[in-house]
Amino acid sequence: MPILSKYSNEQVEQIVDQLIDVLTQHNAPVDLSLMCLGNSITHILKEHVPTGKRQAVTENFAKALAQSVK
């Protein structure tokens, strides 16, 4: 069953393209890119997810990430 999102593919793709553009402008190698994106994810989780839900959200995110690179 496909995952349904409340966001359009176009909206997601535009934001991803902008993130990739910034990394490209800085000639960021893979390790630096992953560090920056990881730090951004950590910031989003700490600032926008209630403490009691962070562990579950983090685990779900990690599972989704692992599935997306298989």
Curated annotation (Swiss-Prot):
Gene3D superfamilies: YejL-like. InterPro entries: UPF0352, YejL_sf. It comes from the Bacteria. Disulfide bonds: none annotated. Coiled coil: none annotated. Belongs to the UPF0352 family. This is UPF0352 protein PSHAa1818. It comes from Pseudoalteromonas translucida (strain TAC 125).
